[in-house]
């Protein structure tokens, strides 16, 4: 008598496609996934609890290590929360430097996603091109703050350092170069028949499902939901810039790809306008006490990171350390839909779907 048995298969925690210590336990029948269970926590460091014993400025380097592919947005959200509680007015030059740093970081983050996602499904050359352009951005950020990955650049009240001489001009020159390369990326990949067969119609979910799972970022917008905090709840100086919010319609891996690729172009628009409007002089840090004490009370702020809505809740009892600190980490929420997406899929689509969700494990585990 012929019989079949379901097999348990571990993907990770050490697996090249997970880009971090992430384990996925899948139950397969032949090549069809019957069940998928994410196992997280391998990179948990207790950031929120540690923060309760740190001064506010000391917390900033810890945020670098959550979403380490987009550290600038993490820096900003903690500073923004404290500034909101203190009612600080940020110098204009500092705001422009913050926006430039965050949008360059957004482009760099999407380049890592583009290159590694394609590498995982079998395309080697895009990975090399993506890291070539990312290296240029990392060099620009290195000139700005002296670090390549964990920047520790922003401060409550502004930024730590002003832009060095010639830096704005280098950023200005980078924009047309990156646009040219982006067109080349589309020629290389976006119309490729093999690639389209791997992503179109794969990993579909509806707008209602995306909202019920609390998805955000490109994982939400790919379903047609036009929601981006830079437009819908503008913070910093984003209301001064003219840019569009890319949205999809089907909610599959292809729509997620298109949304992120178009986001690179929109970030280039913001960078271009920020360079044109950049103040010629001015302070980069507001007058704040050396030891910052947030007033008693609570504050919650949220901003748009490359992976979605990152939020920061602070409860203060008036001391130099927060009484309670809580981050809303978008990768953690985006990951929750993965079991639904994988159920019933061919195992060959697993890596395509996982890469399309674009999680960072430092952010998932916290």
Swiss-Prot record:
GO terms for cellular component: plasma membrane. This is NADH-quinone oxidoreductase subunit D. It is found in: Cell membrane. NDH-1 shuttles electrons from NADH, via FMN and iron-sulfur (Fe-S) centers, to quinones in the respiratory chain. The immediate electron acceptor for the enzyme in this species is believed to be a menaquinone. Couples the redox reaction to proton translocation (for every two electrons transferred, four hydrogen ions are translocated across the cytoplasmic membrane), and thus conserves the redox energy in a proton gradient. It catalyses: a quinone + NADH + 5 H(+)(in) = a quinol + NAD(+) + 4 H(+)(out). It is a peripheral membrane protein. It comes from Bacillus anthracis. InterPro entries: NADH_Q_OxRdtase_suD, NDH1_su_D/H, NiFe-Hase_large. It comes from the Bacteria. It holds the Pfam family Complex1_49kDa. Its EC number is 7.1.1.-. The keyword Membrane applies. The lineage of its organism: Bacteria, Bacillati, Bacillota, Bacilli, Bacillales. The gene is nuoD.
